[in-house]
Amino acid sequence: MAKWREMGLTDEEYRRIVEYLGREPNEVELGMCAVMWSEHCSYKSSKIHLKKLPTRGPAVVQGPGENAGVVDIGDGLGIAFKIESHNHPSAIEPYQGAATGVGGIIRDIFAMGARPIALLDSLRFGKLHSPRVRHLFTGVVAGIAGYGNCIGIPTVAGDVYFQESYEENPLVNAMCVGIVELSKLKKGVATGVGNPVLLVGATTGRDGIHGATFASEELSQDGEDKRPSVQVGDPFMEKLLLEACLEALEYGHIVGMQDLGAAGLTSSSSEMAARGKSGIRLYLDRVPLREEGMTPYEIMLSESQERMLLVVEKGYEDEIIKIFKKWDLNAVVVGEITDGEEIEVFFDGECVAKLPYRLLTEEAPVYDRPYRIPEIKNLQSINPAGVDCGEALRRLLQSPNIARKSYVYEQYDHQVGVNTVVKPGYSDAAVLRIKGTKKGIAVKTDGNGRYVYHNPREGAKRAVLETALNLAVTGAKPLGLTNCLNFGNPEKPEIMGQFVEVIAGMKEACEILNIPVTGGNVSFYNETGEKAIYPTPVIGMVGLIDDLETGLIPMAFQTEGDLIYLLGEPTGELGQSEFLKEFFGDVLVPVPPVDLQEGRRIIELLPLLKKQGLINSAHDVSDGGLAVSLCEAAFAGELGVNIDFTTSLLPQEFLFSEKVGLVIVSVSPEKEEEFIKSVKNAGVFVLKLGRVNGKDEIEICLNGQRVIQEKLSELKALYEGGLSWALK
């Protein structure tokens, strides 16, 4: 096989490289082009579609194109945040794959000059009855916990689903959030002819070589041969690197800073050069090596972790090096900025590579791949009337997709740094205090591939609205979103069709909800053999609560005697709900349409209701439907529920539909009249469901008939134990 094909390049791509250079590249140059032209680094199949997403908003300080997006939260402060995938490595080596995914996203945040304050993770696995899936799940969770806990950054939120489509290809999407003084915001740019280029942090080894290429192809049935492509992480080294970088930034005289992630020194140098429109000359014999005999090819493509590339003002390099030495870290001048337009690489006095930075970045191919919009056909109907509502509630509460994820977050230190206001499991989103202010931020990841698979456009709209509602029910105003788009092979028209429709759905949702996209990540080739994952857009979002004392809305029911209301109009569709899957299997029932306008009104209304003192709690209706959401609010508040309502829907439809855009709120009886007036003035549909009681029970009567009467303590035991039981 031709060398370029082994590296992941097509014949046409190789021809383009030769034509651009006017010569054949040598091995080092070919390797550099191959990693930078990989799907993982170049976004060559997705770029033309990603440009359709709205990226501007009043709070946006930094949009796509940098290490992370940044939004303004006032007081001269910004929030830097980004989500990225580490799917392929985690399928081969779950602990290290997940751990290094966390490490990489943390470096993206502090490269902006921000101090990381929180981690989130969005995970997808096959069904837990498979020993391999249990191995992957426990390994990934341990890897995230091991890295995050050691570095001292709390893992505060996330989401986990278990569905057949992720059997061979798990998804590990990690998000990091950091806080930055906007006046000290730093970018990954290389400028200033003669300025030195420093490589700081860990030594360079052979781990992760061609990791970016590995992430740009389908997994084989036996991925063991790819184990060397998985990087190895050292969280203690990363902690030192984090503190040293922030201290160096505080000292000043740093022009730009970039993480060495996918494609290692090749990508960090070429991306910094492209942003600064400058050349860079590198001397590889100065690079501190972990292993003897490493070639220039290996040094340029190594993805060894815990390394950063810095451009420093000439004359200040010795002071910067002293800072890193104080933290017991390597810091070496490995090059300088030139007035050319090339990345020049020297080794033992010989030029081993000389490539225009444009060839590695903006000249990478961009494909408008053929696509076929998925047909939504052979739709079926079901009659759920025969399903006992009490039995359904019990089964759903202990389903691994709904049951409390105590097994996961009890391994994470979610309190380290003492910024966490609400613990995992007690809110729809994590809430973090911004020290020195009254403010808080709410952060969340969300997405549901099964809905997207059955209707990519509506499913994508659902993912955006669901995440925004998760913030709004805490009292937060959404400021911006990042996304991780996980799909199969883009060379297949049906997969590309899913992607195009998802982008269209996200675009519509972001525009109507006024939430700009600040960046993200695309992960293609999540496919083994002919089996692709569900198309899975994962949305990460950040929102602002102006005053935690007066603006924070709890999820838990607060007071016996409070009235329970539903915001939004229930329509009863069961398409792709957990109820449908549990009792009817894979039935092609239509996905409920998403009412973005109603969702927007509710998102804007909730913080106002709290500020007016008109609601005591709020919780959005999500997985499992209204019945499960009522239980979750009751469990959190240790209070019972009485529902007495008349509806034209079947009880099963009313209680277990997962229509997005419904929110349960509790209201003091003396505030009821004012509450209803405010809600109706906002144009939001509202229904009175019942009231909070002090008993150990949930009682639901519909149309004069009791359909559920259960002890809350027994239901809570199912909810608390479901995931642990599934792992046994």
UniProtKB/Swiss-Prot annotation:
InterPro entries attached to this UniProt entry: PRibForGlyAmidine_synth_PurL, PurL_linker, PurM-like_C_dom, PurM-like_C_sf, PurM-like_N, PurM-like_N_sf
Transmembrane regions: none
Keywords: ATP-binding, Cytoplasm, Ligase, Magnesium, Metal-binding, Nucleotide-binding, Purine biosynthesis
Pfam families: AIRS, AIRS_C, FGAR-AT_linker
Keyword Calcium carried by entry: no
EC number from the UniProt entry: 6.3.5.3
Protein family (similarity comment): Belongs to the FGAMS family.
Protein name per its UniProtKB record: Phosphoribosylformylglycinamidine synthase subunit PurL
Biological source species: Carboxydothermus hydrogenoformans (strain ATCC BAA-161 / DSM 6008 / Z-2901)
